[in-house]
């Protein structure tokens, strides 16, 4: 799998949480819909070159059951992830791939597991309640540290969130949410 496809898969994984089986339709999904633009950069490591990709996204549902569409700037969907208790399904032009859970998906795509469940809360500007967090105090930019990541909320009033993990390979996730 080339690095763009792997990173597209990573983007799908980044915004999902829980274990999954594809829901039958978007109408079955509860929770809030988030949409906007997402950019992910994984710095180079001894095993792999630096990778980056950006996409428009629409996230429906919640950490337990939902769907994520990733689109080109012209609106063509190039990856879709669906999840519900039991299985994760990633659909790309290269085919469908099932995973037992999102940790398995992120390990397959990036070679390591990422804190997917936390990202639902991080995109809403708050720490995930499932793990301890530490607020970042002034004069630093507002935000918090959680699970080895620094979540920067300096531009949250502009609907922007940046999460960065410094541990190698460092990973940066930038999201610009559409306003309702």
Model-derived segments and their meaning:
Residues 1-19:
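Sec-dependent bacterial lipoprotein signal peptides
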Residues 13-34:
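Bacterial Sec signal peptide processing site at the extreme N-terminus
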Residues 20-23, 92, 99-101, 107-180:
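Mature, soluble, non-transmembrane domains
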Residues 33-38, 52-54, 61, 83-85, ...:
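Extended beta-sheet lipid-handling architectures
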Residues 34-74, 78:
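Post-signal-peptide N-terminal segment of Sec-exported extracytoplasmic proteins
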Residues 35-46, 87, 93, 171, ...:
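Charge-rich amphipathic alpha-helical interaction elements
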Residues 56-58, 78-80, 150-153, 174:
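Short, surface-exposed charged micro-motifs
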Residues 65-115:
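An acidic-aromatic
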């Amino acid at each position: 799998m080339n690095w763009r496809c792997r990173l597209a898969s990573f983007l799908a994984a980044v915004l999902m949480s829980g274990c999954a089986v594809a829901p039958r339709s978007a109408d079955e999904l509860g929770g809030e819909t988030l949409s906007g633009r997402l950019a992910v950069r994984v710095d180079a490591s001894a095993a792999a070159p630096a990778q980056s990709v950006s996409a428009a996204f629409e996230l429906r549902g919640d950490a337990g059951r939902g769907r994520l569409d990733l689109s080109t700037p012209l609106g063509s969907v190039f990856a879709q992830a669906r999840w519900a208790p039991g299985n994760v399904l990633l659909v790309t032009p290269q085919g469908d791939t099932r995973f037992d859970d999102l940790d398995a998906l992120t390990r397959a795509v990036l070679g390591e597991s990422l804190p997917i469940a936390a990202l639902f809360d991080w995109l809403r500007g708050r720490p995930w309640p499932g793990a301890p967090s530490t607020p970042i105090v002034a004069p630093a930019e507002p935000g918090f540290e959680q699970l080895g990541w620094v979540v920067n909320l300096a531009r949250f009033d502009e609907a922007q969130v940046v999460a960065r993990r410094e541990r190698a390979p460092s990973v940066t996730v930038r999201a610009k949410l559409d306003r309702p």
